[in-house]
A protein has these predicted regions:
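Beta-strand-rich ligand-recognition modules
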Residues: 112-163
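Extracellular and analogous surface-interaction loops
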Residues: 89-101, 135-140
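Aromatic-lined ligand-binding clefts that engage carbohydrates, nucleic acids, or primary amines
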Residues: 95, 100-113, 145
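A structural detector for beta-sheet-dominated domains
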Residues: 14, 94-96, 106, 139, ...
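Beta-strand elements of well-folded, non-transmembrane domains
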Residues: 91-95, 109, 151-153
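Extracellular beta-rich ligand/substrate-recognition surface
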Residues: 75-87, 122-127
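Accessory carbohydrate-binding/adhesion or oligomerization-edge regions at the termini
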Residues: 1-71, 148-171
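Residues that act as N-cap/strand-start positions at coil-to-secondary-structure junctions
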Residues: 85-87, 97, 107, 130
């Protein structure tokens, strides 16, 4: 029998943030640190628009493409999405009961994933596209999923996206 697949449909995106090194990637920005107050308005950071209030994006067949929301304000096709950057995506998924699940992720570059404020994955994958399966426990009701994804100036820099599918496993 094929397992039931859930995927968050709507994501709140925040960013981009400077991310040139592992130290930068480990820097806690306001989406992952509730003690940091989000700015009230948009502001400029290193030649790119930094989004303080969320931009909402609907997933397309489980995919969230950061490049659609964080393109630089330059004309033409050169450098359309920021490199040496990271951004966050936040969504909720509802569960009818406490249950074990597997999060299937597809992504490029570095990623961190939290479920209900618990860090469940850190991956500093540098070469091409990667897939990871993460066992998690969903609680009855709303479950928060927060993803931080980087984009670097490498051969795959045009791919600043991730796919998130949740396979239910009955307890």
């Amino acid at each position: 029998e094929t397992p039931h697949v859930l995927t968050p449909y709507k994501w709140a995106l925040y960013g981009p943030f400077n991310c040139e090194t592992k130290t930068d990637f480990d820097q806690k920005e306001f989406p992952e640190n509730e003690t940091i107050v989000a700015p009230d308005s948009l502001h400029w950071a290193k030649g790119r628009r930094n989004i303080a209030q969320p931009t909402w994006l609907e997933s397309e067949n489980t995919w969230i493409d950061f490049a659609r929301s964080f393109r630089r304000n330059f004309g033409g096709n050169v450098g359309t999405q920021p490199v040496k950057s990271s951004a966050y995506a936040l969504a909720e998924i509802k569960s009818d009961k406490d249950k074990n699940a597997i999060i299937n992720l597809g992504f490029d570059d570095w990623i961190k994933v939290w479920v209900n404020d618990e860090l469940v994955l850190t991956s500093t994958h540098d070469k091409g596209f990667a897939v990871r399966q993460i066992p998690v426990t969903l609680k009855k009701g709303k479950n928060k999923i927060l993803i931080k994804l980087s984009n670097f100036d490498n051969i795959e820099w045009r791919c600043w996206a991730f796919s998130c599918r949740i396979l239910n496993q009955e307890l």
